Amino acid sequence: MGNPRSPLDRRLRFRNVPFLPPRIAASSTTTARSLKAKTMEMRFTIAWMWFPSVLLILGLLTPPSNGCTVDVGRNVSIGEQCRLRNGATFSKGDIEGNFSGPVVVELDYEDIDITGERQRLRFHLSGLGCPTKENIRKDNESDVNGGIRWALYIQTGDAKYGIRNQHLSIRLMYPGEKNTQQLLDSDFSCERHRRPSTPLGKNAEVPPATRTSSTYSVLSAFVVWIGSGLNIIWWTGIVLLAVDALGLGERWLRLALSHRDKHHASRTAALQCQRDMLLRQRRRARRLHAVSEGKLQEEKKRQSALVWNVEARPFPSTHQLIVLPPPVASAPPAVPSQPPEYSSVFPPV
């Protein structure tokens, strides 16, 4: 059967076994609940142990700067190519041209990942001379000659899988001469000002063959693709942490409720035991008092009878019993009063 006090006993695997003592049944054993808690704890440890490692690997695989191109139109010169600085695209230079009227710079920014998907952002910078009704005649009378110095600082988000290929294009736009009187007569806004504009620069995309991008090895791209970005790893850790917190809270709640129930049950059992002992003492004292006064005779202990009314019969034996003759009434007792003479039994040599 095994020793129920031993933690190796197979009966301890079952919590609702009727023949186990309550103290042994309530002891801490390796159950499904404890295994689940250990699994959750191990999952939590693995998640937060691998999270800094993945960050370090991605930081080593990602180059310090990604390539980008600036596509400018005719009569435009760029003093400095764009580059990445602290995760943001920073570009500045001089725009030289011969044009009249206010200037609107339109910037198209494309973010291309390793899968070929593009994330395009468009910015309209109209602060170089957004006209109003008061100064539009003055702006039309004078031509803007020379250069316009510009500086762009564009903050972009992370691309898919952490791999980027930027493409920048700049266009210069100015209102046509035919639309000047229409702008004077109607309500003017910068948005309406952009619509009749004519682009001076070209807006052609850079062919795929001329795109500048960092060289990634197949292994690093595969590792980054498996990681699916830092967001998935971060949210996985958050979800595991939330699951572990819920499991720990549920475990503490069950322990608190079970402790309260056990305390109440033990107190009830102790009170019931005291009540039963008091009743037995009173019943025994009442019975002894009745026996001492002679009102009640002390009962004799009953002999235990056979169950199911089975008659007592001797078990059959293979050896035949020796049948002795009945003793004679006048014969002396079988037990001698004096020991026999040993000399007659054992003669001397």
From Swiss-Prot:
Biased segments, Pro residues type: 328-339
Span list, region Disordered: 328-349
One Pfam family from the record: US30
Name recorded for this polypeptide: Uncharacterized protein HHRF5
Organism encoding this protein: Human cytomegalovirus (strain AD169)
Biological classification of the source: Viruses, Duplodnaviria, Heunggongvirae, Peploviricota, Herviviricetes
Gene: US30
